[in-house]
């Protein structure tokens, strides 16, 4: 591969001189930084100085890598944006949440682009991993990079997109054994990006034909799962009214070879319950109002209330007083084996139970808030 694109510092054949930066050290960014640090020099940047302090102390608040991995990692953790100037290859992995009205909140990715732009040098490549709707990288991020750096994209620096596929709490599917989608603004950039990720992704890379294709691929991955879970949730509501056990139905139907195995559940977190809104937002901007995607979202968003109402019905059937009933909820985070509480649907259950005069007791041993060097529980 030619080293002309990003200069000798980023030549893949000379790993000793390679410097890569990771902007955003959360559930997605941290595992990526640690993985690359085993191959090249890595600058791990995050605005949260307290989080950086934890990492430097060998504490992993995300629980994605583990304290021992953090302690032994060679990542250069920093909250000083000037350190980004040491790198020629930059990966941006910041959150992309939604606003209260379910419109995309691009503030984190715009902020990361602003910081990176201020410290971008000629010959660099910037790769975005944050989940966005098609067009964000080229139409929103690139102009910010150009404005802040005074450089010209395509001449002074290049961009690409490689959607994150980290599944928080999943110790089986890791960055090394999940096929990585990569894309670049041109063939030369795509080749460099592919070679860089191949350093850590043993499963290989898939070269998308364009940045927009890669962006679209990511946003439909989570949308597809959201829709399928919504279908299962709707079935569970129907079968519950019929007095039929949903799990038994799914077990029977699952004996057919082409029956997709999904299950009812609460859809929370920062991905599956959020990403569909990015796609429908862009669709509406183009004059198309989503039918299936938004229907699935409504079903999943209402499941917390449905669970609470069912609990109250069971209390009544058991002839237990509803008001001030002793109710325990085991688990508070948005999914099992993950300390992340963002968009957890347990909050919806609690709010609904309070409407009935019930103040539930919540227990979750994985739920930790690292607001200081000493973790405290979610209470």
Give the residues covered by each predicted segment.
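Short acidic low-complexity segments
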Residues: 73-87, 372, 376-379
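Interdomain hinge/lid region at the active-site interface
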Residues: 212-215, 223-321, 325
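Internal alpha-helical scaffold of NAD(P)-dependent oxidoreductase catalytic cores
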Residues: 143-162, 166-258, 282-286
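NAD(P)+-binding Rossmann beta1-loop-alpha1 motif at the extreme N-terminus of oxidoreductases
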Residues: 13-57, 328-356
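Single conserved hydrophobic/aromatic residue that forms the stacking wall/gate
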Residues: 1-12, 370-379
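N-terminal glycine-rich dinucleotide-binding loop that anchors FAD/FMN and/or NAD(P) in oxidoreductases
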Residues: 60-75
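A short, aliphatic-rich alpha-helical micro-motif
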Residues: 5, 70, 81-87, 120, ...
């Amino acid at each position: 591969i030619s080293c002309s694109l990003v200069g000798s510092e980023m030549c893949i054949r000379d790993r000793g001189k390679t410097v890569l930066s990771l902007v955003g050290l959360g559930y997605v960014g941290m595992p990526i930084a640690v993985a690359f640090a085993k191959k090249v020099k890595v600058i791990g940047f995050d605005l949260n100085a307290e989080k950086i302090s934890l990492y430097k102390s060998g504490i992993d608040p995300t629980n994605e890598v583990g304290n021992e991995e953090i302690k032994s990692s060679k990542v250069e953790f920093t909250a000083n944006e000037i350190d980004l100037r040491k790198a020629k290859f930059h990966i941006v992995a910041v959150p992309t949440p939604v606003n209260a009205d379910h419109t995309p909140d691009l503030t984190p990715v715009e902020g990361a682009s602003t910081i990176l732009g201020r410290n971008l040098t000629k010959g660099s490549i910037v790769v975005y991993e944050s989940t966005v709707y098609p067009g964000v990288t080229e139409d929103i991020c690139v102009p910010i990079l150009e404005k802040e750096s005074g450089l010209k994209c395509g001449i002074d620096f290049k961009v690409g997109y490689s959607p994150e596929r980290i599944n928080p709490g999943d110790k089986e599917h890791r960055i090394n054994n999940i096929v990585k989608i990569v894309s670049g603004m041109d063939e030369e950039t795509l080749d460099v990006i592919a070679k860089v990720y191949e350093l850590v992704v043993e499963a290989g890379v898939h070269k998308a034909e364009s940045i927009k294709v890669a962006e679209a691929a990511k946003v439909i991955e989570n949308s597809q799962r959201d829709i399928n879970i919504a279908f299962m949730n709707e079935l569970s509501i129907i079968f519950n009214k019929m007095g039929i056990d949903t799990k038994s139905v799914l077990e029977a139907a699952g004996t057919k070879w082409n029956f997709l195995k999904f299950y009812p559940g609460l859809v929370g977190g920062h991905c599956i319950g959020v990403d569909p809104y990015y796609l429908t937002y862009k669709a509406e901007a183009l004059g198309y109002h989503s039918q299936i995607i938004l229907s699935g979202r409504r079903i999943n968003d209402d499941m917390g209330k449905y669970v609470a109402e069912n609990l109250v019905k069971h209390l009544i059937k058991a002839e237990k007083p509803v008001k001030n009933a002793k109710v325990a909820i085991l688990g508070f985070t948005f999914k099992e084996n993950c300390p992340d509480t963002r968009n957890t649907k347990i909050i919806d259950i609690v709010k609904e139970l309070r409407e009935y005069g019930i103040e539930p007791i919540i227990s979750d041993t994985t739920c930790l808030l690292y607001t200081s060097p000493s973790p405290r529980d979610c209470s």
